[in-house]
């Protein structure tokens, strides 16, 4: 039984390139990693983890997407979106607004109306207290 659980965890493991704080999720960081493009199977796009964050101002959007701000313990925040997950455990964790979450995703350009920004595109969410 324990061996099966370990194998299942290993199959679901995500590769993470760096653990960062929301304050580090900047356009400058995104642009520095964009120099490594083009991305594909042999050169995956960098994945980042945020630890101990809270999903603030979560909104369920059309299509089951969840938009929020991920806020770290120091109050620094990054805009974030999780695609088609509102009905899944990851989406429910974001929509609950609970803190202490670990989030994995990728930085993406968020350019609108002449403003160049960045958003965190969420791939997975976990609550370490539930492991």
Ranges and model annotations:
Residues 1-131:
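Acidic, two-metal ion nucleic-acid-processing modules in DNA metabolism proteins
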């Amino acid at each position: 039984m324990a061996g099966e659980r370990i194998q299942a965890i290993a199959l679901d493991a995500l590769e993470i390139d760096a653990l960062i704080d929301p304050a580090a999720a900047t356009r400058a960081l995104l642009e520095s990693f964009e120099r490594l493009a083009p991305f594909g199977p042999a050169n995956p796009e960098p994945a980042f983890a945020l630890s101990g964050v809270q999903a603030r101002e979560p909104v369920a959007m059309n299509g089951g997407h969840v938009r929020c701000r991920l806020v770290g313990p120091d109050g620094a925040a990054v805009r974030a979106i999780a695609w088609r997950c509102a009905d899944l455990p990851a989406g429910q964790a974001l929509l609950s607004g609970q803190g202490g979450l670990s989030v994995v995703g990728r930085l993406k350009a968020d350019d609108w109306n002449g403003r160049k920004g960045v958003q965190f595109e969420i791939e997975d969410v976990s609550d370490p207290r539930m492991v």
